[in-house]
Every structure is written in C-alpha cells, then in structure tokens.
C-alpha cells in the first residue's frame, strides 16, 4: 500500500510531539542516519556570525568593602529576601540577573558598581 504525501502529513499531524520524536529515532536507527547533527552544524556557522547577542548575564564578581550597600542594591534589583541576597553577595561570581537586555544589564552594573561592587556583564 502506497501512501500519498497528503496522507502522511495528515497522519503526522494527528500525533503528539513525543510520538514524532520517537518516530524520528526509529527512522534514524532503521536507516542508519542522524537527522540532527548535519543540520545543526550547518545552521550554526552562518547564524553565529550574523547574530548579535541580545541576552546578557550580570555577574557579581566581588562585593567590595561596602557589602551592606551591595546587599541592599541586590535586594532592590532582584526582589530577593535578605538571606538570599546576602548569600548571593557573599558567594561571589554569581549571576545577579540572567538573560537581561543590554540596557538592563548596564543599568544593573552601574547600580551595583555605585554601591561598591565589582561586576561583569557576559
């Protein structure tokens, strides 16, 4: 029995994503191919050169001498409780904010540096 492309599309549309993923694995094993590796490698090269970073992580490197002001600033920026903010500040090299926009990351960096902390944006 030969299926048309429309029949195959209809059959696949009725399946869940997990069922489709399982089907892909089965086909890869049966045919001895890998669907993900060549496609991902080819797509990653050109896209990386053109793509500009849009999400930044603000890392608190060191609280400096004025730890209390830095803890207050971390609490204000993140909404963390006193204990959580203190633990974050004392640990060092921890992310204060992850996935921030460039503007937000710079604002957070300036605020923490004004409080006496050493901060990096990655």
Curated annotation (Swiss-Prot):
Biological-process GO terms, alphabetical: translation
Domain of life: Bacteria
GO cellular component, one term: cytosolic large ribosomal subunit
The keyword Ribosomal protein is assigned to this record: yes
InterPro entries per UniProt: Ribosomal_bL12 (IPR000206), Ribosomal_bL12_C (IPR013823), Ribosomal_bL12_C/ClpS-like (IPR014719), Ribosomal_bL12_oligo (IPR008932), Ribosomal_bL12_oligo_N_sf (IPR036235)
Swiss-Prot/TrEMBL keywords: Ribonucleoprotein, Ribosomal protein
Pfam family for this entry, one: Ribosomal_L12
Gene Ontology MF: a single term: structural constituent of ribosome
Keyword match Ribosomal protein: yes
Signal peptide feature range: none
Function: Forms part of the ribosomal stalk which helps the ribosome interact with GTP-bound translation factors. Is thus essential for accurate translation.
Family the entry assigns: Belongs to the bacterial ribosomal protein bL12 family.
Subunit and partners: Homodimer. Part of the ribosomal stalk of the 50S ribosomal subunit. Forms a multimeric L10(L12)X complex, where L10 forms an elongated spine to which 2 to 4 L12 dimers bind in a sequential fashion. Binds GTP-bound translation factors.
Protein name per Swiss-Prot or TrEMBL: Large ribosomal subunit protein bL12
Lineage: Bacteria, Pseudomonadati, Bdellovibrionota, Bdellovibrionia, Bdellovibrionales
Gene: rplL
